[in-house]
């Protein structure tokens, strides 16, 4: 599934340090020759493509990034130290453009690729630079040059790691709103979700995964019924499918097992490879089930559904059971990322563009 994630940042490279006016102090000589050193270079701002990242979510919480300025020159021919550089980790596929003009400045297309997005200013000259046969005791110096400052727009075509499957009103939108920054429309009637919603689930610093809420499927979706047929193809590039089931439907005549079986049938009809993709069962709306009935209802569902895979019991509304599920998803996604070998193929984010060339 392809979405566009974006963030705006301000970067400032370090200013160069100022040059120094200084003279040697020797015995019987009040002023020796000039020995004022140059200022140090300001720190650069680099960006590096990190294959372990898949969103720009961290840059929404930290917009300003500044490198250190260079130190000033000193006497005894001592140059100022260069300012510390900073390196910003960004996902592979990030497009960096000028926020004011829209001009594309850089693209990070390969893992480990490093670019300079703001250059530090050069250090100023000390007075030793101005010594000449005519001027043996120069008092001139120059200030450091300012570092580059830029307002940048970061743009990333995001691939969803996790896709949510389920019948309309199974609670997928409530789940994605509970665990991520997405705010889909939520209501008590089917087909609330009319378009895919993307949510970034933050597990920790530089630890996140992307989850996509697909419009609810109905029986016959693989042949074009309902709203879900046009979105089934987007699930093919996800790393994990979560099959969300409403375990407590308002209509008591509705059989959750029959609904879940219909969803699995649509997957099998649409694409055998998609059907074989890792899939976990998420039994939702347990807050609507009396506590003394939960275990029996879950056991009955799993038995009738003939399910052998992982099962998670949650209430997206109260967030009960959501945290263990989030941690398990992250571990699964991370393991798959590490197992995938870097191959020289067209990045899926740009597959459409490459096909049209």
Swiss-Prot record:
One Pfam short name: GTP1_OBG
Family statement: Belongs to the TRAFAC class OBG-HflX-like GTPase superfamily. OBG GTPase family.
Transmembrane intervals: none
Residue span, Obg domain: 1-159
Keywords, sorted A to Z: Cytoplasm, GTP-binding, Hydrolase, Magnesium, Metal-binding, Nucleotide-binding
Function: An essential GTPase which binds GTP, GDP and possibly (p)ppGpp with moderate affinity, with high nucleotide exchange rates and a fairly low GTP hydrolysis rate. Plays a role in control of the cell cycle, stress response, ribosome biogenesis and in those bacteria that undergo differentiation, in morphogenesis control.
Binding site for Mg(2+): 173, 193
Known EC number: 3.6.5.-
HAMAP family according to UniProt: GTPase_Obg (MF_01454)
InterPro entries xref list: G_OBG, GTP-bd, GTP-bd_Obg/CgtA, GTP1-OBG_CS, GTP1_OBG_dom, GTP1_OBG_dom_sf, OBG_GTPase, P-loop_NTPase
PROSITE patterns in the cross-refs: G_OBG (PS51710), GTP1_OBG (PS00905), OBG (PS51883)
Main subcellular localisation: cytoplasm
Cofactors that this protein relies on: Mg(2+)
Gene Ontology molecular function: GTP binding; GTPase activity; magnesium ion binding
Organism (species): Paracidovorax citrulli (strain AAC00-1) (Acidovorax citrulli)
Annotated protein name in UniProt: GTPase Obg
Cross-referenced CDD domains: Obg
Quaternary context: Monomer.
Gene it is expressed from: obg
Record: residues binding GTP: 166-173, 191-195, 213-216, 284-287, 315-317
